[in-house]
Amino acid sequence: MRQLKREVKIGNVTIGGNNPIAVQTMLNVPVEDIEGNVAQAKRCEAAGCQILRVTCPSAADAKCIEAVKNAVNIPIVADIHFDYKAALACADVGVDKIRINPGNIGDDDRVKAVVQACQQKNIPIRIGVNGGSLEKHILAKYGAPVPEAMVESALYHVHLLEKFDFNNIVISIKNSNVPRMMEAYRQLSAVTDYPLHVGVTEAGTYQMGLLKSGMGIGGMLLEGIGDTIRVSLAAEPEKEVEAGYNILRAVGFAVAGPEVITCPTCGRTQYPCTEIANEVEKRLQGYKKSIKVAVMGCVVNGPGEAREADIGIAGGKGEAVLFIHGEPVKKLTGDHILDQFMDEIYKI
């Protein structure tokens, strides 16, 4: 059962409570390239990104934040490290949320200045704890970025913001070690009702990043923990968005758009099952209808394995049986099985 947290409004998206889990990503174009950032932001929006983070190393770089915000219709989060004046500049240009890393933002007075700027414009703050940048005294106390250390860091900064009468807060508590990350989120969720941004940081190269994020983020969601997610990949941010939605689908959340399932194939396969499945998925990119499509390797187990699909095929030599909701309907034959199948999909 989902652990319900207080609601926080980020631009036109509300997280927490019973609101849908929002999928985030972060631009990776150098901040000096404003045109490149705007173009990438538009691609992320088209891919379904719901909350978009942009780095802001200095106050002067707030102009990139402003340009991106004016170019898309999704909330923009300013990612702030070291320079609290960058956060103040982003608040001035109307950013929708500010993320600060407590380990490097500076002393309490600087945090207070950021809080006051956000209070004036009702801008939420994400406390972004990262296992790689814990405060020195906390790291010295625990010896390593163990879950208890990360939770202590997060709660210290929550209490600091609360001391300044600020509670428009989101928390993340990321680690590249999946078991540590999961245990940290469990401990944090047990002691706070602020919404949680869930992710695995420094997850590795693309394939390993997918695996670690699937295990870490998916595992947390299955435990009812998480209000917004970001899949960190060494890839274009659009791929992070796609992966985020796939994780939500995999753990049972209703997600708009099609899901393509296929079998791993075996020696019984007599038609290009994998190639057809990949092409079906490619052609259905951007298709908004929520349907499950199955492409199965043979008629032995195919229909049974894909019984819960809305539509599917199970192939044979030069033909494929079309089934709808697990029931065989007709045979598709010839050299254009894929095209015939796509025609049937669009009828569903």
Predicted feature locations:
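N-terminal amphipathic alpha-helix/helix-capping segment at the start of soluble metabolic enzymes
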Residues: 1-26, 119, 282
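Hydrophobic or amphipathic alpha-helical targeting/insertion segments
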Residues: 85-126
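Catalytic alpha/beta core domains of metabolic enzymes, predominantly
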Residues: 129-133, 138-285
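Active-site mouth loops of central-metabolism enzymes
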Residues: 18-36, 55, 74-82, 138-151, ...
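Hydrophobic faces of well-ordered beta-strands that scaffold small-molecule active sites
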Residues: 21-27, 52-54, 76-80, 98-100, ...
